[in-house]
A protein has these predicted regions:
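Repeat-solenoid scaffold signature
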Residues: 204-245
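Beta-propeller blade signature
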Residues: 115-125, 176-189, 244-245
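Short acidic/glycine-rich loop or secondary-structure boundary segments that cap or lie
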Residues: 229, 236-242, 249-253, 259-264, ...
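Acidic, Gly/Ser/Thr-rich repeat motifs that build Ca2+-stabilized beta-propeller blades
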Residues: 20-170, 218-221, 226-234, 286-324, ...
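Conserved blade-ending motifs and adjacent loop-strand segments that build the rim/top face
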Residues: 213, 328-349
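Bacterial N-terminal signal peptides
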Residues: 8-17
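Surface-exposed loop and turn segments in beta-propeller and other repeat-based domains
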Residues: 69-83, 131-148, 188-209, 253-285, ...
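Bacterial N-terminal signal peptides that target proteins for export
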Residues: 1-9
């Protein structure tokens, strides 16, 4: 499935600084003193939310009660560089299973690490994660501290998608015998589906759904087209939005709009577009350092309808994209005046936008339009 927006791709490469001033929003600080929070997930029935802290703690936040003590039973994480405790997601059947999924950096035997994913049962009193089971390990373990990815998305059809970085080992994103630089697809129990694209490909990892990805930091289901969307960090320039489809190659490091941090070209790169690879849906020439993303699919604030919100770590704001089907038509910014790295963005069951800032004194923010 190709995107009509690609016809006007050069128009999408304009620097973000050329867009209009940030829209006015109202911001409430719900929690201070979060030590590098990474992700949040809403619990049902007004029970608050779960928040991961990069250092390895999972906590519960409730209105009027604040932050809990650390939840017991979280696996040991490799807290180094960009590694640590990463995403959190509730199983689709959480109401009966109480299953909570986590992604995290896991140490290997040689001082390197990779992304691992597993789940446990959240106790009825929300204080313990019981019988934690690891169902996925990124192999081989290659990271010395970079590019873990780690976002978790259930598609509503019985499958879990995991975004995986290439551990700063560029060529591995093209290697089908390695799990670096991939999107993988599992069942809701952690098994490999029989219809994954490379199940019958000799020496390929059967978990792989798509490949050629650098460092995905945000991932979400588009509720209007029912497609998986992913954002990923480019190197120096070339942050992208992609729609990872079955068996397709998204180019890294062969195709990129970025260069090395040194200013030199990426050695493996053959151009911005390369035959046999998928062009991105949207590209930033100047990298915002994209992070968590959320589609606004609520009727609470009509002015936000059909918007996609993406956090930006380097630019320290939230990017707002207007979405029509599988195309992006316009961009704006909010929260830039706060000067905080934005790590995660979620739409709450109440229709408000919830934002985590990635600082040693990180915050949980509740955001709404200034004119509700």
């Amino acid at each position: 499935m190709r995107r009509s927006s690609l016809i006007s791709l050069p128009l999408l490469l304009i620097s973000a600084s050329l867009f209009a001033a940030p829209a006015e929003v109202k911001v409430a600080v719900l929690q201070n003193k979060l030590d590098h929070p990474w992700a949040l997930a809403f619990l049902p029935q007004d029970q608050g939310m779960l928040i991961t802290l990069k250092g390895g703690q999972l906590k519960r936040w409730q209105p009027g009660k604040g932050l809990s003590d650390p939840i017991v039973g979280v696996p040991k994480v490799w807290d180094s560089g960009q590694g640590g405790l990463l995403d959190v997601a509730l199983a689709p059947d959480f109401a009966t299973s109480r299953r909570v999924w986590l992604s995290y950096a896991e140490a290997g035997d040689d001082g390197k690490a990779g992304t691992a994913v597993g789940y446990g049962r959240l106790s009825d009193d929300n204080t313990r994660l019981e019988a934690f089971r690891v169902v996925f390990r990124q192999q081989p373990k290659l990271s010395t501290g970079n590019h873990f990815g780690g976002r978790l998305v259930f598609d509503g059809k019985g499958y879990l998608f995991i975004g995986l970085g290439e551990n700063n080992q560029r060529p591995t994103a093209q290697d089908l015998d390695k799990l670096q630089g991939k999107v993988v697809r599992l069942t809701e129990d952690g098994a490999v589906p029989d219809d994954n694209p490379f199940v019958k490909t000799k020496e390929a990892r059967p978990e792989i759904w798509s490949y050629g990805i650098r460092n995905p930091q945000g991932m979400a289901m588009n509720p209007w087209s029912n497609t998986l969307w992913l954002n990923e960090h480019g190197p120096r320039g070339g942050d992208e939005i992609n729609i990872p489809e079955r068996g397709k190659n998204y180019g890294w490091p062969l195709a990129t709009h970025g260069i090395n941090y040194s200013g030199l070209p990426i050695p493996e790169a053959k151009g911005e577009t390369v035959a046999g690879t998928e062009p991105p849906l949207f590209v930033w020439k100047k990298s915002p350092a994209l992070s968590g993303m959320a589609f606004y699919n609520s009727d609470v604030f009509p002015q936000w309808k059909d918007k996609l919100f993406i956090g930006a770590l380097k630019d320290k704001d939230v990017i707002v994209l207007n979405v029509s089907g599988n195309s992006v038509t316009e961009e704006g910014r909010i929260l830039g005046d706060r000067n905080q790295r934005v790590r995660d963005v979620r739409v709450g069951p109440d229709g408000y936008l919830y934002v985590l800032t990635d600082e040693s004194d990180g915050q949980l923010l509740k955001v709404s339009p200034s004119r509700e």
